[in-house]
Amino acid sequence: MTGEQSCSLDTAGTPEQRLGVLGCTVVPGERRCSALTGGWSDGAGRTWTGPLAVLADHVLGEVANRPQAAGFQPVTTALSLDVLVPPPWPGDRLHARAARTAGEVLRDHVTASVRDPDGRLVAVASAWTADVPAPGTTPLAAGPAVGARPGQGEIGELLTDLTEVGSGPDEAVLELDATGWTNQNGTVHGGVWACVAELAATRLTGSAPHAVNRLQLAFLRPGRGRVRLTATALHRGRTSGLVEVRGRDATGRVCVHAMVGSRADHAAPGAVATLSPAGRNAPPPAR
């Protein structure tokens, strides 16, 4: 199916489309997918990294979305994203390419690269996927081509569905009504988990100009309905930061474990002034 658009996106309303992801192109040995980045800004001059994980999660998952045995469906069990060039990026879209790197029966490892319109590598991603039993379901098939331009302000829609339950110097808690942010299996989309993990983690960076450069997520069990994410600061230094995020369902079970890494954004206004002379482990200035 060289050059054809074919992927599992529905024609409207999916988290991927709401966050700018367009349909996939199938070429020998890989999938290619683009995303419009105009809706990744919160309206306050900040472009978020999390939606990049939605693009990565989608194109990586499509590689694994091959014909399944009856009674099985593919799921992503782990997702890793390294941002090599922080936003904002030139142009209005990014382009991803993904391919299978290794695998065995019912399990695959896939990798992806993401480039800007000038061909510059801005991010790399990888995922582990697995085929899991799904009694009573039919194998997933490629859906219709998706080419409609998504609306703008998508990250704002996600922010609207978030509630800040509590926050302090070392912990932040957010709740998400995930009803409208599910994948085709009816569970919280992996890229959406990444978005909210980033949003929770940034509550703990204070005024230090850190840019998220690494997202690692382990998907332990499906999440549905209203979910709660608790972010805990592990390190906030002059050059890097690390925040642990745990996502739970309404019963309190951990569905997702995430690590959000950041590095000092020396291009940000006042970056040098906010670097603490006390050493790597000094906290950022008070908000």
Question: What is each stretch, according to the model?
Answer:
Residues M1-W40, A127-G180, A273-R287:
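Non-catalytic linker/capping segments at the edges of enzyme domains
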Residues R18, R31-A64, Q68, E175-T202, ...:
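Hot-dog-fold acyl-thioester-processing enzymes
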Residues E30-R32, A78, R93-H95, H109, ...:
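Intrinsic-disorder/low-complexity, polar/charged segments enriched in Ser/Thr/Lys/Arg/Asp/Glu/Gln
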Residues V26, A56, L81, D108-V110, ...:
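Structured N-terminal alpha/beta-domain signature
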Residues G61-H95, R100, A200-R228:
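Hydrophobic beta-strand-centered segment that forms part of the acyl-chain substrate-binding groove
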Residues A172-T239, V243-V256:
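Structured core of small recognition/catalytic domains
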Residues E62, P87-P90, A99-Q152, R221-R226, ...:
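HotDog/MaoC-like acyl-thioester-processing domains
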Residues A35-T37, V83, L176-A178, F219, ...:
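Hydrophobic residues in beta-strands and at strand termini
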